[in-house]
């Protein structure tokens, strides 16, 4: 309920309050040593108010915790500004999390109950989501925005169909569609989408070659 209240307040904020917020462009969620690992990816420059003012770049390492809720609370407590997720582009799940079906289901339940992230963001899987950040220095924009454009371009080129968070959360309950998520890999600091992950019924996950 607290998260929902914060999100509702953010929607009503005036432009003068932008300086009190930071804007994650992506989020990564994985499983590490039996716990949830969570973190945000931030832009280098403000992209929300048509100015070139530098964001307060928050270089906070991902945090771990027993639940997604505890991770979000811990991460937010370390930020100097309030995280406004309304402009987020991409959510990346780690392969370890996807193989831990219990925790994966718990994460989806938390996201559905809280509405923490926009329903229209793209969802993909990576063996090591943190490795994606190692490519950011060579990118023309922040990693989240880059991934959004890259995924859209690859979909247009026939690499596969993209899946948005809202649809994923709905299918968790409907169990109608065979869920296919882009699988991202890195090689020589370059990101590739070569494979798809299929989640038939949320009970197991495996990688399928194109």
Which sequence ranges carry the predicted segments?
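Membrane-proximal alpha-helical signals and transmembrane carboxylates
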Residues: 2-210
């Amino acid at each position: 309920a607290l998260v929902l209240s914060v999100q509702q307040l953010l929607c009503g904020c005036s432009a003068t309050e932008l300086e009190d917020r930071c804007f994650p462009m992506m989020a990564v969620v994985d499983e590490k040593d039996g716990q949830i690992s969570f973190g945000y990816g931030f832009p280098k420059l403000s992209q929300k108010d048509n100015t070139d003012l530098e964001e307060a770049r928050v270089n906070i390492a991902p945090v771990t915790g027993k639940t997604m809720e505890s991770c979000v609370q811990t991460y937010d407590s370390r930020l100097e500004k309030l995280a406004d997720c309304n402009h987020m582009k991409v959510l990346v799940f780690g392969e370890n999390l996807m193989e831990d079906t219990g925790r994966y289901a718990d994460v989806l339940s938390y996201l559905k109950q809280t509405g923490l992230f926009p329903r229209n963001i793209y969802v993909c899987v990576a063996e090591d989501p943190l490795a994606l950040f190692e490519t950011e220095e060579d990118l023309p924009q922040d990693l989240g925005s880059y991934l959004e454009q890259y995924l859209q371009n690859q979909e247009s080129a026939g690499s596969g169909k993209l899946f948005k968070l809202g649809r994923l959360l709905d299918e968790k309950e409907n169990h109608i569609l065979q869920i296919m998520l882009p699988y991202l890999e890195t090689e020589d600091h370059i990101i590739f989408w070569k494979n798809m992950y299929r989640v038939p019924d949320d009970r197991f996950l495996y990688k399928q070659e194109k």
